[in-house]
Amino acid sequence: MDRNVYEACSNIIKEFGTHVVSADEVLAEKIDNAVPIPFKTREEIDADVEKDRNEGVFEGNIIPDIDLRVVHYYATQLCLNKYPHLINAFDETSLITLGLLIEKWVKDYLTSIQTEQGRQSKVIGKGPCEFISKHIDYRHAPGNI
C-alpha cells in the first residue's frame, strides 16, 4: 500500500494494528530516511517554549490550541471547491502556520476595544486582521475565497 502524509494526518494508517503512524514517519519512509526528521516529545517542546518565553522571544503557545484537523478539513474543502487541482497540497507546516495565523487574527480581533466619545466599541485591531478581510457568506458561497 502506498501510504501518504495526508492519510497519516487523518490517523488512517495503523502499524501492526496497534498504533497510528505519524505523518513524520510516513514522510521519512518516502525519502528512504535520507534526511533525518527530528522528533520532539511534548516535554521537549514545552521546555523549549518555556526557555524562549523567558528570553522574550515570543508570547503564547508554539503549537496552536485550536483543533488543526478541523482547520485542515475546512481549508481543504474551501480551496478544493474553487481549485480542485490543489488536492493534497497541504502539509504539516502549512497546517501549523494556518492554525497560528487564525489564532493571531482571533486574538487581534477579540482584544481590540477602543473608546470613542466616552463609549467602548469593538473594532478590528491593528495588524493582519485590518488588512486581510473579505465579507463572505460561506453558507451560500463556500468556495469563494
Swiss-Prot record:
Gene: RRN10
Chain's role: Component of the UAF (upstream activation factor) complex which interacts with the upstream element of the RNA polymerase I promoter and forms a stable preinitiation complex. Together with SPT15/TBP UAF seems to stimulate basal transcription to a fully activated level.
Stored InterPro entries: Rrn10, Rrn10_Saccharomycetes
Domain of life of the organism encoding this protein: Eukaryota
Protein localization: Nucleus, Nucleolus
Any one Gene Ontology molecular-function term assigned to this protein's record: RNA polymerase I cis-regulatory region sequence-specific DNA binding
Subunit structure: Component of the UAF (upstream activation factor) complex which consists of UAF30, RRN5, RRN9, RRN10, and histones H3 and H4.
Keyword vocabulary terms for this entry: Nucleus, Transcription, Transcription regulation
One Gene Ontology term, aspect cellular component: nucleus
GO-annotated biological processes: nucleolar large rRNA transcription by RNA polymerase I; positive regulation of transcription by RNA polymerase I
Protein name as it appears in the record: RNA polymerase I-specific transcription initiation factor RRN10
Originating organism: Saccharomyces cerevisiae (strain ATCC 204508 / S288c)
